Curated annotation (Swiss-Prot):
GO terms for cellular component: extracellular region; membrane. It comes from Oryza sativa subsp. japonica. Its main location: secreted. This is Expansin-B1. One of its GO terms (biological process) is plant-type cell wall loosening. Belongs to the expansin family. Expansin B subfamily. Glycans are attached at residue 32. Expressed in mature anthers but not in vegetative or other floral tissues. It comes from the Eukaryota. Keywords: Allergen, Cell wall, Cell wall biogenesis/degradation, Disulfide bond, Glycoprotein, Membrane, Secreted, Signal. CDD domains: DPBB_EXPB_N (cd22275).
Length: 267
């Protein structure tokens, strides 16, 4: 017969194992979602955060660096993405359709969302942490509040092209810390692929395109010993390889914490 101390040890070990296994299992992330558009739907978990009918973050920002994600063209239809969706910032601005068929409040009709933030909860290979507004958009009419009460749900998603109104153009926000020797540029409202893999600038009268480095989210930066002088053009490359040139997008006398709207857009 086992001694009482051995029995006690077994009980303690069993309790420890039980405690460890009580939480949800950690699921490794899936392969990165790329620009392979098609009709195939993939499985994902969806949650929501922020105000029930809000845009997500309390400050209407997020890990991509966008501001005012409650306003056009995002209009609060936003989501955090886990690693294979957010892609360390390279997924910022990409667009997805997402839908659910269960629980009963689900409409099974897709809602269009934009990636504006990140999450790292390992609850599924693909995980969308949606704004309250976007989560509710998957519901049947009048059932959005009921759906939000479900918490975590199973969904299906697919990547789609981003489409914006004709007057929405690629826009640049020069970040607050920028100065003539350091430029930090937030790139937003890119149609088509939505996400950006390269940003370059060219000063007026020069033939040289200077590559910016990724800073964080959708923000790109360049340090230069020679002061940058406007106007300069910006060349943006999307994940699918489309190159868009915004001629003289940043004017002479540009200022930090300023927004400059180009006159170009991706396809």
């Amino acid at each position: 017969m086992a001694s009482s101390s051995l029995l006690l040890a077994c009980v303690v070990v069993a309790a420890m194992v039980s405690a460890v296994s009580c939480g949800p299992p950690k699921v490794p992330p899936g392969p990165n979602i790329t620009t392979s558009y098609g009709d195939k739907w993939l499985e994902a978990k969806a949650t929501w955060y922020g105000a029930p009918k809000g845009a997500g973050p309390k400050d209407n920002g997020g890990a991509c660096g966008y501001k005012d994600v409650d306003k056009a063209p995002f209009l609060g239809m936003n989501s955090c993405g886990n690693d294979p969706i957010f892609k360390d910032g390279k997924g910022c601005g990409s667009c997805f359709e997402i839908k659910c068929s269960k629980p009963e409040a689900c409409s099974d009709k897709p809602a269009l969302i934009h990636v504006t933030d990140m999450n790292d909860e390992p609850i599924a290979a693909y995980h969308f942490d949606l704004s309250g507004l976007a989560f509710g958009a998957m519901a049947k009419d009048g059932k959005d509040e009921e759906l939000r009460k479900a918490g975590i749900i199973d969904t299906q998603f697919r990547r789609v092209k981003c489409k914006y109104p004709a007057d929405t153009k690629i826009t640049f926000h020069i970040e607050k810390a920028s100065n003539p020797n350091y430029l930090a540029l937030l790139v937003k409202y890119v149609a088509g692929d939505g996400d950006v893999v390269e940003v370059e600038i060219k000063e007026k009268g020069s033939e040289e395109w200077k590559a910016l480095k990724e800073s964080w989210g959708a923000i790109w930066r360049i340090d230069t010993p020679k002061p940058l002088k406007g106007p300069f053009s910006v060349r943006v490359t999307t994940e699918g390889g489309e190159k868009i040139i915004a001629e003289d997008a940043i004017p002479d006398g540009w200022k930090a914490d300023s927004v400059y709207k180009s006159n170009v857009q991706a396809k």
